[in-house]
């Protein structure tokens, strides 16, 4: 193993080998006997040694070449390795007196350095001939390695001596010139000498000559390293060009650890970007510290074989592009044709109807407001002609002045301009939840990027966190989450009603509110026009009213109830009535009489916490106000989560044309979520069927009743369903104090898991799809014994058991809502080996 170079300096004489000491002794003797002023002798010796190394050096393999440990020194560099073999007691330069004494004497021919060098070179040639005559020892044999190593050391010593002599010769010349300039002797007077500028120019020429010689030496050395012996008795040949290095294999070489530590291995390379002598088509590998002209190849250019590879690569790329580009164009055209066949493009804003409209048509006072169509994310389907007209204080901007109510969704339903036979024909509708009133479990993408530290759990905190970007981000959600295509699909699924959620900030906001104001209003109006286009009737549903009616995230703000309760309870009561005053004036227009056929007061007021009488009084007052303003639609009041049997005695003296709205789920009740698949279907067809049928009558119940929300979800596994960051009853992670899992196999096993319920619907088994479809059809059958139903909800990002659209397209919802395969009274089908914990 090579010795660490610094160790050789530090421990000289203790760990060096006998050949090393011989080399140092020989070097000292050479320093004493050499005439440092004999320039011609130095050059002759150097040239002779170069020829010797080139022509007669021992045959070595490439891996043993001395080039792996050799490196260039600049002639002016002071390097510790150059001095390693010298005796500190022997001065590098003799005094002037010694030099004059030596120059005065004459050398004997036998003792002259030239004679000794000739004898030494002759001895070496004779030794080489003797080795060749006897046959070279095997590669790696001990004596071969020892002789080669000793010669290598001596050759390196010669090179070091030559560099040192040249350095000292130059210094002596400079000192002599300086001494002459300083002399007062007329012989040495400055008037007989060159000027300082001339001397500087002369030194510059010397330096240039030295650099040129050093560069030539480096090039010769590099060429020497590329040679290798083939066999002992055959001439040398150039190494073949390197083959492609396998990927992952290092291109580096093993060198002295000291050299690597110093960063001075001759094979260490760095990569330079672009440029450089060969044309810069790609990055070039250069020796560290080398200039561009030192690259492989003549005069810094790229070798032919590399150029050939480059041209081949360029040709391949050109051929591939010639194939790929036409294919891409064809595919792009096909995709564009497919997109043009659809009614909407869900990903990009559609603003083509602004073409031909001048920005100057918008008054200065309206520019940059909700009345300025150039600020709208999506203008398709809107009338972008400016108007500041309002009805009930609410803008009609975006509406067309004409409409057509002759459409119907299917042949089972009368057109819009004919009355719908409520009471004799059931409603088959769907909700647009999570759209204009945002809910985390329906659109989790709006909430997933925040941590629990951010506290983003509802629309209030979302808008607060978004800050100035809230309006643009939320309008993009409005424009893309529900589009015209959704209304066409709702019609095609056999549905005939749509329950549209919106909140009070569509109408107005108050000091301190974080919500985005009024933008959702125009999307509500456009949605109604899309419903008109496809013959769908509308139920309006205020999901969030001032102060929050239940404190849940879908009311806008999760937390305490501030409506009819708390410090601002009465203020928010007044505000909510003002909201209905404006809304009822607007929707009492003739254009809405045939399409807005059901008008909701408030979604899910928490009557288990609020004073029941206060809620009933507000409901009566609001209904009278609405009807006074001209609303002829049915007005709905929610059951407030009270037992339906209690409603038999409530609001018995109420205004006409009112519906009771109830929401039925099995997953939020721990006694029902643990039921097995067949038991849940029997619960719906036996208990719910009779309950809904009874409450729908005025004699034994309350009167006309609809089911405004239900789903086919049989677990509460959906992300964020129980609030952001809350667990599930199904797996026992819902309660902070109770880890009981509520699923059919919780006690007997296997353990409950949400992985199956939350899987992609394409992975649902046929048995599970059969259950989900039967479970949905059973609920349809039960709710159709009253006024009908609205499924919750039409579209979700990732909750298939809550999305009518996903179920319909994946085969676990009837293809036509009016033509189910199962109804209560039929035999419950066998679900095979469907696991109960699925």
Swiss-Prot record:
Its EC number is 3.2.1.58. GO terms for biological process: cell wall organization; glucan catabolic process. Residues 1-298, 335-359 are annotated as: Disordered. Glucosidase involved in the degradation of cellulosic biomass. Active on lichenan. Residues 332-838 are extracellular. Belongs to the glycosyl hydrolase 5 (cellulase A) family. This is Probable glucan 1,3-beta-glucosidase D. It is found in: Cell membrane. Residues 1-310 are cytoplasmic. The gene is exgD. It holds the Pfam family Cellulase. Residues 1-23, 111-124, 149-164, 200-221, 234-246 have a biased composition (Basic and acidic residues). The keyword Cell wall biogenesis/degradation applies. Glycans are attached at residues 383, 388, 400, 553, 565, 643, 696. The chain crosses the membrane at residues 311-331.
